[in-house]
Amino acid sequence: MAGPAPWNTNGKTCLMAGSGKFGEPGPYKVARKDVDLGMIQANQNSGMFTIFYPNPLEASCLHPIVAWGNGTGVNGADTYAFFNTNAASWGMVVIAAHESNTGTGAHHKKGIDYLIAQNDDPMSMFYKKLAVTRVGTSGHSQGAAGALAGAGHPSVSVNVGVGGPSTTDAKHAGLCLTGTEDIASTSCPAAPDRAKGPAFAASWQGGDHVSTETVAGYITKDAGTLAMQRLYAAWFRCFLADDAVACNLFKGATPNDCGVCKEKMMWAVLKGANIP
């Protein structure tokens, strides 16, 4: 199996021009498809996945892959659908596990392997439509830990943790998203300080780990939602699709000079390192 592509290289990844406002719907319409991948681990509740994908899929370019994992106790694909629908509207094909125990990374890896196989299957709607060396993992809480474990898949080069850890090694571009009241991801703001590869940390003022509206207080449907899903989509768009506009949100002449760093929003922490 081919290894992950280096960051910011010229490739045939889909880069349909959009507004550049990554918290808002991108240039692609989005459809959903459910698949049952059966038994993946002993303590699982579900083998179901939902695929969020651009509709129609491009014929002349390849769509990057993202695998998502839910937080503890969250079943199905609807709780975090706004995150993954938005990413798909910006060109990603996101496969989201319905499972609530995703911390091992097994569901992330299974989802990635499924889409890679679909890319090789002449009978599949995804046949020759996917950038199988442009792959990312993501998740919330326990799912973020699973995304970190799932980043061990040989095709993965990008990782996003929401309310949980993200990668800091030299092989992956890692983004962690958290809130100032989130006691479950207190290490996130300092992640870029120990990163050997591209890394960025963003902490929303007043954001917590859980709330009554959705599982993550800082991804409720308010300004925090748009801010978080904006960086989520932009990170993948930057490192999986070579989008210079997206990359400029995270980089600058100094750590405090990045595009999003200059904005007057409710961010308590915005910090990057090694952004190419």
Model-derived features: where do they sit?
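Gly/Ser-rich "nucleophile elbow"/oxyanion-hole loop immediately N-terminal to the catalytic nucleophile
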Residues: 56-62, 106-145
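Short beta-strand element of the alpha/beta-hydrolase
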Residues: 61-71
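A conserved short beta-strand
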Residues: 154-165, 172
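Active-site-adjacent alpha-helix of alpha/beta-hydrolase-fold enzymes
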Residues: 170-234, 238-240
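Short amphipathic alpha-helix adjacent to the substrate-entry channel of hydrolases
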Residues: 77-96
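N-terminal cap/lid segment of alpha/beta-hydrolase-fold proteins
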Residues: 3-61
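Catalytic active-site module of serine/aspartate enzymes centered on a nucleophile-bearing elbow/loop
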Residues: 222-247, 263-276
